[in-house]
């Protein structure tokens, strides 16, 4: 009998990109969806219960992909959506002419679907890579979006 070598591509499980959490349970430096964008909470304050209802929670968050500031106020008993945020360090292999990164996962698979980040981080990444440093790129994934948010020198190499 011939040996079967089936190759299955991994796909999204179809799980929700967010989960509900009561507003009063959210914390500073946590994540929350503000104006349908995944944000990191940078400021939170609670107002007292008024004569017409619930205590209110005022939140200020920074979009984890665009760094835009968003604000929202909601009753402390209401549920807010919290994004499922996944963080992964990938080894930088190459940078293409059209600014796409070639990254290697821990399992050895190559990814070529992420662009060099805009601004200072992108410039630093190019400088360090061109000077021959072995780099790890920290990739943040939430709500179907991904981007490189940080770089660091790979110290785990066998010398």
UniProtKB/Swiss-Prot annotation:
GO terms for cellular component: cytoplasm. One of its GO terms (molecular function) is translation elongation factor activity. GO terms for biological process: cytoplasmic translation; positive regulation of translational elongation; positive regulation of translational termination; sexual reproduction; translational elongation. Gene3D superfamilies: 2.30.30.30, Nucleic acid-binding proteins. Keywords: Cytoplasm, Elongation factor, Hypusine, Protein biosynthesis, RNA-binding. It is found in: Cytoplasm. Lys-51 undergoes hypusination, a unique post-translational modification that consists in the addition of a butylamino group from spermidine to lysine side chain, leading to the formation of the unusual amino acid hypusine. eIF-5As are the only known proteins to undergo this modification, which is essential for their function. SUPFAM superfamilies: Nucleic acid-binding proteins, Translation proteins SH3-like domain. SMART domains: eIF-5a (SM01376). Disruption phenotype: Severe larval growth defect. The modification Hypusine is found at residue 51. Its main location: cytoplasm. Translation factor that promotes translation elongation and termination, particularly upon ribosome stalling at specific amino acid sequence contexts. Binds between the exit (E) and peptidyl (P) site of the ribosome and promotes rescue of stalled ribosome: specifically required for efficient translation of polyproline-containing peptides as well as other motifs that stall the ribosome. Acts as a ribosome quality control (RQC) cofactor by joining the RQC complex to facilitate peptidyl transfer during CAT tailing step. Functions as a regulator of autophagy. PANTHER family: TRANSLATION INITIATION FACTOR 5A FAMILY MEMBER (PTHR11673). Belongs to the eIF-5A family. This is Eukaryotic translation initiation factor 5A. It comes from Drosophila melanogaster.
